[in-house]
């Protein structure tokens, strides 16, 4: 029994010791787990700190990038705004300069008007003084005549009135001369300055078109192929193009004759294509004519676009551009109308710039002033009426329409640009070499000029000289006085302006000559 108790105690002790050892081992294992956990946690913390530092750097870099990008956007926006502000400032400066130029022009015109009014006031005062002197002189002469000649009151009055009339005619002629000379001096000085500068800054080639075109052939055998069997080829070509083909003894050449330059050009293009192709028969001729017409339409469009580009106009209705291109194949007195229109546009733009007007609008009006000539042989009416209708149809500005309608005086000019277009048109048409007239028209104009001057009372005879640029009027000295000669020159000038159409100016010179001959014996 003691042994059993001892075993039980031993077992209990062993169990207690086992529990103790197990507890100790479990505690150590737990401590090891805690140490491992601490190490793991420490590693995680260190890793987290590293990742946090890395993320922090990335966030800082991203923030810096965003800040830099935002700053760049702000700077670009500020730069754009500064540019807009600068553009607005430049526009304001240009407007101020334009206003200054207009103010200067107005001031100059006001000063000129004041000077003219002052001169007129002085002349009016002088006229009053002269009239007072005349009245005094009349009274003195009346008394003297009654005392010395013992004339009746009516006779004396008639003599005095006749002499007074002669004196007043003399005074009127003097005042007219002084006023005209003063106005002409100022106007000529200003106009010459503007026109000279405009002409120096503008240059345009003028090519005198004819009514025939010569096509060169590779050999004379080609003439027979162009004529064709029984003349079928030449008849087909003439029928389709409306142009006469003249085939004569001229070596290696065919002459195309016609008054429509566009048809003549289509015929030339067709004939050259046929010669190059070698196949010449009615069907091929018809095909080539159609092809040449299409090429001609494209060429006309390109010519119109080049014209507005040369002038500096950027927008225009496509149909109006094509009509403008047709002017290249239209002539007036031998002057190419498109080149003339470009020259007028440049001259008008230069003059408008000098006067502070809208340069682009002035060029547009100058370029389109003769647009009606492109269709005047197809549509009834004058080229001015057709031009106004075209400009209205394609919604051109009112200033352009008025310039087209008024450049020949058909309607009243309502703007300065319209006046400048008419002046530039006259400058371009009247300069030497720009235009040529037929001999018949030239002779008729000279005869008409002389007949107008010979129709005035007191004119002995007249001579048109300088190719019709001047007319010299010889008057009868016993019928026309010196003072009346001045008035006669003005009347002849007005009559010429009313009855004749001519480019440029015509100088009227009245010559009064008195000769006294005596013979010594």
Swiss-Prot record:
Domain HD: 337-430
Entry's Gene Ontology BP terms: mRNA catabolic process
NCBIfam families: HDIG, RNase_Y
Family, as annotated: Belongs to the RNase Y family.
PANTHER family cross-referenced by the UniProt entry: RIBONUCLEASE Y (PTHR12826:SF15)
Keyword entries, A-Z: Cell membrane, Endonuclease, Hydrolase, Membrane, Nuclease, RNA-binding, Transmembrane, Transmembrane helix
Span list, region Disordered: 77-107
Pfam family name, one: KH_1
Role this protein plays: Endoribonuclease that initiates mRNA decay.
Single GO molecular function: RNA endonuclease activity
Domain of life where this protein originates: Bacteria
Record's subcellular location: Cell membrane
Gene from which this protein is expressed: rny
Transmembrane segments annotated in the record for this chain: 5-25
Enzyme Commission number(s) of this protein: 3.1.-.-
Span of domain KH: 211-271
Name of this protein: Ribonuclease Y
GO cellular component: plasma membrane
SUPFAM superfamilies per UniProt: Eukaryotic type KH-domain (KH-domain type I), HD-domain/PDEase-like
InterPro entries, per database record: HD/PDEase_dom, HD_domain, HDIG_dom, KH_dom, KH_dom-like_a/b, KH_dom_type_1, KH_dom_type_1_sf, Ribonuclease_Y
Main localization of the protein described in the UniProt heading: membrane
Top-level class of the enzyme under EC nomenclature: hydrolase
